[in-house]
Amino acid sequence: MKKFLSSLVMTILLSSCAVDKKKLTENVGKYDPPNIDDTSFKNSVITSKNFDETWTSVVDFVNDSFFKIEKLDKDSGLLTLSFSSKEAEKFIDCGDFEYTLFFTGEEFKGSYIDYAKSGLLAVLEAKMNINIQKIDNKSSKISINTNYTYSTQHALGYYDPKLNQTYSFVSGGHQTINVINPISGSIPTRTCKSTNFAENAIFNLIK
């Protein structure tokens, strides 16, 4: 009986090792895209401040923030801002990612942005257009549209534009692309969307 139990335990251990070895013959991973079904974002609001108050509040805020003013025209109520950030996760959401490298055993589990930041040398750039319009002497309307560009490089150690990929989307929007050489076990696409953090920073100011 003891010999039988010993043989059974050994068989289980060997089987377990065989499974582990099989799993590590290639890089494997998993990707979960962000939720793109949330369509509650509105790109315009009406405030109880008049035009001058709203304009001054917005300009003062952006002058002391991460935004850079590209163009400013009070007569037309238009502001064009730009921004880029090493903390892309504040402004966009690209889902969650994990992998195990068979050669080194290295593992990663976290946001796709954290992975792309170091693994794909990702860069976020955005341009925001703000339009402030007078409704009457006591209220105004502010509309915001932002164009996001999130660029990744799939060639490490050298530059090859053919291996660069870019996500382009607007406020409240998203883009899904087929990525170059998706890791085994993951879906072939990646999705990035706006978190509306930048837009809400303006909207919350004038509410």
Named regions from a protein language model:
Residues 18-207:
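Ser/Thr-rich, low-complexity intrinsically disordered terminal regions
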Residues 1-17:
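Sec-dependent bacterial lipoprotein signal peptides
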